[in-house]
Amino acid sequence: MDKMLATSVYDEKLKSWIVYVDSEGLLLPVGRTINEDLGLFEYCKFNTKEEAIDWINSKPNIKYDKDLIVR
């Protein structure tokens, strides 16, 4: 199985680093659903870029790619 590619981006509004994973050409933020009925989603936030990259590297099926661009 190929590894999914991921990158980290600083979000000014959230004041945190967010991880995005490439899923079939779409860059999706990492997080979790906190209320499915209301469609509420919470981002997985990191204090530093290094923490975000360490999280990516700790996952066996995800690989960090600094060249992915989140728009």
Describe the role of every protein-language-model region.
Residues R32-Y64:
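A short, charged, amphipathic alpha-helix used as a generic interaction element across diverse proteins
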Residues M1-I34, D67-V70:
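Short N-terminal "domain-start" leader segments
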